[in-house]
Amino acid sequence: MQKEKNKKQSSLSILFMAGVQPYKNKKNEKYMNTKQIDHFKKILIAWKNQLRNDISQTRLNIQDKATNYPDPIDRAVQEEEFSFELRHRDRERKLIEKIEKTLKKVENKDFGYCESCGIEIGIKRLEARPTANLCIDCKTLSEIREKQILG
């Protein structure tokens, strides 16, 4: 239950960060029309900019906190903190690459459709994870296969 609540909060935080409200479909509205494309483009660009700002801030923080402690334990703690921050930022860098790939799909009008089966991914799923490239059914199958392979 708590995990589901956190997912919903993180999905909403992406929308909040972009300064947009959840998209409201209108009756008989064409999927991935100009209005929807603009909605997701705004979300993706804001998300990418936020991640870039976070990465820049981390660099500044590491430079500010870099101290040569005489105590080896203090140095080890500091190195571990820096290592953790850098791993976190590396994940964010990879996410930026995924966002840029998704923005190219938006430009090429390939956005919003499952790469595996070609059906619509859906507005709500894309708002929850704008970089999603599989519909929920194909993603579920992919995760089941992954569990079977990895044990």
UniProtKB/Swiss-Prot annotation:
Biological-process GO terms, alphabetical: regulation of gene expression
Main location: cytoplasm
InterPro entries for this protein: DksA_N, DksA_RNA_pol-bd, DnaK_N, Znf_DskA_TraR, Znf_DskA_TraR_CS
Oligomeric and partner information: Interacts directly with the RNA polymerase.
Zinc finger (dksA C4-type): 114-138
Alphabetical UniProt keywords: Cytoplasm, Metal-binding, Zinc, Zinc-finger
Subcellular location(s) per record: Cytoplasm
Protein family according to the UniProt entry: Belongs to the DksA family.
Keyword Acetylation: no
GO MF term set: zinc ion binding
The protein's name in its UniProt record: RNA polymerase-binding transcription factor DksA
Cellular component annotations (GO), alphabetically ordered: cytoplasm
Residues reported to bind Zn(2+): C114, C117, C135, C138
Its biological purpose: Transcription factor that acts by binding directly to the RNA polymerase (RNAP). Required for negative regulation of rRNA expression and positive regulation of several amino acid biosynthesis promoters.
